[in-house]
Amino acid sequence: MRLNFERSKDSPLNILRRMGYSFLKHTPQGEMSFVKRVGYDDFPRFHVFSKMDQKGNVSLTLHLDQKGASYGGSFAHSGEYENEGVLEKEAEAIKKEFLNPKL
């Protein structure tokens, strides 16, 4: 699921951390990767890729990782990408936070 925000008042790093996300890594594509556990185990978890341009516009890609990679050396995993259920609720919470950040 893709979310776009014009001229964010705060950085994606700060906003997502306030929402309980942990920074995971920088990607080769120049994105920041964040994860947020749904329960006590490593999976399932929300996974967000974030990129901000020079004008402050933010592009997020959100999905739900159901489990880790099923074989060594692979990044492929089972995930949900559609706009429904728990993923839609998380997207709405992210939209609310990006539109009205607590500075």
Regions inferred by a protein language model and the residue ranges of each:
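A structural detector for beta-sheet-dominated domains
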Residues: 4-6, 37, 63
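Terminal, regulation- and interaction-focused segments at domain boundaries
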Residues: 1-18, 99-103
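Ser/Thr-rich, low-complexity intrinsically disordered terminal regions
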Residues: 10-47, 54
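C-terminal basic regulatory modules in eukaryotic proteins
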Residues: 49-103
